């Protein structure tokens, strides 16, 4: 999977879960500060990513995932 493909899919999930504009979901966007995501939003986002990519994301894998770019890295590592 290409990085842009993962970013586009994460953008789709973020727009649906967080009700943000697609243009605001960039690799540098921070989930809490820039996209106004709270902890429940982040849980829903992870569930959406797990379903979209058919992956499992243990809680410990989420440590350090603070930006959309970090989420792209995590997804790419999971789908290999």
Give short role names for the model-derived ranges.
Residues 17-36, 52-64:
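Phosphopantetheine carrier-protein modules
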Residues 33-52, 70:
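Phosphopantetheine-attachment site and its flanking helix in carrier
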Residues 9, 16, 39-45, 61-64:
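Residue-level recognition of specific faces of alpha-helices
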Residues 11, 28, 46:
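Generic structural marker for isolated residues within well-ordered, non-membrane alpha-helices
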Residues 59, 63-78:
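C-terminal structural segments of small proteins and small subunits
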Residues 1-23, 77-79:
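Thiotemplate assembly-line natural product biosynthesis machinery
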């Amino acid at each position: 999977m290409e990085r842009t493909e993962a970013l586009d899919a994460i953008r789709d999930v973020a727009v649906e879960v967080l009700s943000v504009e697609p243009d605001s979901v960039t690799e540098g966007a921070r989930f809490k500060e820039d996209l106004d995501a709270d902890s429940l939003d982040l849980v829903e986002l992870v569930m959406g990513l797990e379903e979209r990519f058919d992956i499992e994301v243990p809680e410990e894998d989420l440590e350090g995932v603070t930006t959309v770019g970090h989420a792209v890295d995590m997804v790419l590592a999971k789908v290999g």
